[in-house]
Amino acid sequence: MSFITLNNFFNTNTFFGLLPEQYAPFDPLIDVLPIIPVLFFLLAFVWQASVKFR
């Protein structure tokens, strides 16, 4: 039940701000930018696995 509520919350535009109209071409880039720190976090595990978690 709470998942449905959270899902509806994240789908509305009240949580995420809208970019001004002149920045509209950058909208797809803005959607991807928050994922970059997660990729660095996963890269740390891949790096440690490659050196056998020394």
From Swiss-Prot:
Coiled coil: none annotated. The keyword Plastid applies. SUPFAM superfamilies: Photosystem II reaction center protein K, PsbK. One of its GO terms (biological process) is photosynthesis. It comes from the Eukaryota. The keyword Acetylation does not apply. It is found in: Plastid, Chloroplast thylakoid membrane. The chain crosses the membrane at residues 29-49. Keywords: Chloroplast, Membrane, Photosynthesis, Photosystem II, Plastid, Reaction center, Thylakoid, Transmembrane, Transmembrane helix. GO terms for cellular component: chloroplast thylakoid membrane; photosystem II reaction center. Residues 1-17 form a propeptide. InterPro entries: PSII_PsbK, PSII_PsbK_sf. Belongs to the PsbK family. PSII is composed of 1 copy each of membrane proteins PsbA, PsbB, PsbC, PsbD, PsbE, PsbF, PsbH, PsbI, PsbJ, PsbK, PsbL, PsbM, PsbT, PsbY, PsbZ, Psb30/Ycf12, at least 3 peripheral proteins of the oxygen-evolving complex and a large number of cofactors. It forms dimeric complexes. PANTHER family: PHOTOSYSTEM II REACTION CENTER PROTEIN K (PTHR35325:SF1), PTHR35325. One of the components of the core complex of photosystem II (PSII). PSII is a light-driven water:plastoquinone oxidoreductase that uses light energy to abstract electrons from H(2)O, generating O(2) and a proton gradient subsequently used for ATP formation. It consists of a core antenna complex that captures photons, and an electron transfer chain that converts photonic excitation into a charge separation. This is Photosystem II reaction center protein K. It comes from Euglena gracilis. The gene is psbK.
